[in-house]
Structures are given as C-alpha cells and as structure tokens.
Curated annotation (Swiss-Prot):
GO terms for biological process: protein refolding. It comes from Novosphingobium aromaticivorans (strain ATCC 700278 / DSM 12444 / CCUG 56034 / CIP 105152 / NBRC 16084 / F199). This is Chaperonin GroEL. Its main location: cytoplasm. Together with its co-chaperonin GroES, plays an essential role in assisting protein folding. The GroEL-GroES system forms a nano-cage that allows encapsulation of the non-native substrate proteins and provides a physical environment optimized to promote and accelerate protein folding. Pfam families: Cpn60_TCP1. Residues 525-547 are annotated as: Disordered. It catalyses: ATP + H2O + a folded polypeptide = ADP + phosphate + an unfolded polypeptide. It is found in: Cytoplasm. The keyword tRNA processing does not apply. HAMAP family: CH60. GO terms for cellular component: cytoplasm. CDD domains: GroEL.
Amino acid sequence: MAAKDVKFGRDARERILRGVDILADAVKVTLGPKGRNVVIDKSFGAPRITKDGVSVAKEIELKDKFENMGAQMLREVASKANDAAGDGTTTATVLAQAIVREGMTAVAAGMNPMDLKRGIDIAVGKVVENLKARSTPVAGSSEIAQVGIISANGDTEVGQKIAEAMEKVGKEGVITVEEAKGLEFELDVVEGMQFDRGYLSPYFITNPEKMTVELENPYILIHEKKLSSLQAMLPILEAVVQSGRPLLIIAEDIEGEALATLVVNKLRGGLKIAAVKAPGFGDRRKAMLGDIATLTAGEMISEDLGIKLESVTLAMLGQAKKVTIDKDNTTIVDGAGSAEEIKARVEQIRAQIEVTTSDYDREKLQERLAKLAGGVAVIKVGGATEVEVKERKDRVDDALHATRAAVEEGIVPGGGTALLYATKALEGLKGANDDQTKGIDIVRRAIQAPIRQIAANAGHDGAVVSGNLLRENDENQGFNAATDTYENLKAAGVIDPTKVVRTALQDAASVSGLLITTEAAISEKPDDKPAMPPMGGGMGGMGGMDF
C-alpha cells in the first residue's frame, strides 16, 4: 500500500481553498449575458470554446493533490446543479466559492465549524422559503421563450425554437437536441406516438413515392406473442374485411407462413393491412404494448390475461385516425383512447419514475411518458464550423433544461436579483449562539456574489450595483447587464427558473458545509523512486547492413 500524505487544520483548509479558487475563477468568468468564453485544449482535434460552466468545471484537474480535492468538490457542486435543474451551474459555483471563503476565514478566527454549518443551513432554508413565496407560474409561450433566451445568453432564436417545440409536444413531451448539417436551426416534430419499428415487408407500402405505409382510420390488433399461423386470426380478419377499414397488426414477430398470407391478401386487394414488430424487449415490451392499448382504446391480446386470438372481437381492437409506417418507425396519430385513461396511465408511469433508482430505467420511463402525453420534438443545431455547432448545442441544452425547470416550479426576476433581495429575509435572523448567527451572515453575504459577478463581467463595480438595488422597494427592479440599465426585469424578460436558483443555492451550501468542517485531508504521496532510464537505441554489432 502506498504511503499517505496527511495535512491538518489550517494547512489542509488553505490548500483546499486554493483549489476551490482556481476552479471557481475559471468558471465564473462565463456568468451573465456579458460573460466571457473559455477555451479548452483537447488532446486531439480543435480546442473547444464554451460558455457552459459545467463543461469548464469538468475539464479542471490540478497537479497538487490537496488543491485538486478542493477543485473536485466544487466540480461536484456544478455537476449536482446540472443533474437537478440542468442549468445554474455557474451560479452554484460562485455561491459555493463565496460560502467556502467566508466560512474558512471564520474557522481560522476560532469559530466552531459545526455551528457555522448549522447557521448556513438555517439561512438556506429561509432563503428557499422566500424564493418559493416570490415565484410566479410561467404564463404562456412568450415567457417560456424568454427563459430560453436568457439561459442561451440572449440568443432569441434558441428561446423561440424551444417555446415552439413545447407548444407542439406539450410540457411533458420529449425534446431532444442534435447537431444539424446546415447553418440554421431546424425543428422536427413528431406528433402522436412513435416507436422504432418499421414495416415487416415492403409489400405493405401504400405510398411508393415516400416509401411509407399510410393507413387511414385503421383498427389496431395488439398481440403480445409471435404469430406463426393465421388460422386463429381468421374470425377477426373476416370481421375487419366486412368493416371496410384497414388493419395494423403489432406483434412480437410474424413468421413465414403468416406473413406470406398477409402479403398475398394485401396484393390481391382484399385486405388493407400492415404488420410491425412490437417495440422494446421483455417486460418493457409488455409495458409499451399496454401504452399503445391505452392510447388507442384497444386491449392487449395476451394469454396471461386469458384472451385468445380466436375469441377477439372488433371491440377489442384499438383505433386511431391515422397510422404512418416507414422502414424504421411507426407513428400512431390521434388514438381513440379516452383522456381519463391516458391520464391515469401517465400518473402510473410518473409514480414509477419517482421510485426508480436506475438512470436507464428513468430515461426509458420518461420516453414512455412523453409518447403518451405529447410527442417528440428534435431541435437540430447548425453552425459554420464544428466548434461553433458544439458551443451552440451546449447553450441549447442549458436553455432547454432551464425552460423545463421554469414550467415545473415557476420563475423569479433574473440577473441574480432574486437571491440579492432574499437577503432581506435574513435581516434580524439569529441562531442559537454567535457562531450560528455568523453562519447566517455568511449566507447573507454569499447570495450577493452572483449579481456582483454578473456586474463585474459586464464591466461594472459589483458592490455599487448591489448597493443601489438593496435601496429599492420594488423587488422586480434589477440590473440588466445586457443593456447596462436598471429596470423592471420581469417586464424586460430577464427571468430565471425558481428551481435553477433554488438548487444552485442548496447544492452550493451542501458541499461548502462539508469543506468548512474539514479538519484533515489525506492523499497518496508521490513516488520518490526515479523514473526508469530510457531504453538504449540501435542494435550494436549489426554492421554491413547499409542497403
């Protein structure tokens, strides 16, 4: 086992604080509408230019092991804020640096670290209450667009595209971000439920130009098992033919003879039919077939439920306004399912999301939720160069997470003013002793740091800006760094999601509290052995080999 290097007390805290400062100073230059870019060198390819706080934080690794501990703890703050709200990483980093600095100064002056931490926790709870009380729900797509614009550093097109996508697929819908081939932003929206299974035979195609199957007002047979023979299906097939409507069969698989029979019937014109494989695998397949059944007001034909193919009636089949199938995807538009049943199914999936511990399962459940509740939108981000596309994609991702957070918990005035005005909630608040009261005071000063940094990045004195605002009575009044003016920020569209501001503060306080209460730090000692000498070059005694 390698020898360890152990640092205690002030020495440990000072080393850790140096690491915190290095990471925070690199991240905080990106804060606000006039924040600067950071260039990150890559071991291969072009350098990456970004204004995304968490991307900068993830790249920082320091040589000194103790300084690196501080940097990595602060990186954890940015990552946690990113995971919880998807944005606010730079704000969280600035807050954490401010709390750690003030806290370590207080500890060096002889205060009890545990009481300081208790005071910090009391103050954070009070500020969170204040933020929730002042939060207002998002009203309409113009405010959604505005949140996106602010998060994307004033890029109007980004905010508008996100608002448009949310309008089309609903607030629960899936919105993904991809890189485009061209220069422009594009928005592709798939309405209805889409799953990644195409037609089983090209003979089912009804639109040769687009190479798609289009079924208007079809019945949908949802079968859990394989179909190898159509014998059991004959009664339901005859009923569908008599109804004069098309039929879509969704089954685990349709094998040789059964598929050949369907194709022959389709080609002879007696049966408007198409067949696709069921989406997913194992238990997830069952769940997705259940979703399709709910959406189309059909029943899943499963022997587990005691339903056999021979006894299926038209009433058991699902229905939809239109089904479109290409070689890769099937889209069901406007299923006949009742709103109440779909809502109940959505709530059931939501409950599963709450209890699952697996990120993969959560992602798949959210996909199912979106397919039931709304649809899928893809924002394609274009640009002149690969570097520009990646930088814009970072900003679109941030903006998308921020708008989702705004829809979830509402909005507060932006630009760091929500936290600045929350200092008023801490006035006169006392802890159980002087050290706890000092902890409350640390938070009161720290929550002024974001607005000071935004002002500093815009070329103003942060202390003057925060002082001017604290004299204001209207809490919507703030400093708009984009235009260098004091104005009503809500009216000017400078707004932040409450969830982003709240999680930034809670995550910053959580990690800062741990750093302040650190009394010893242990790291592996560097190896003192000299490096091995390089291998000797050439192969001696091999003369006469000059060709």
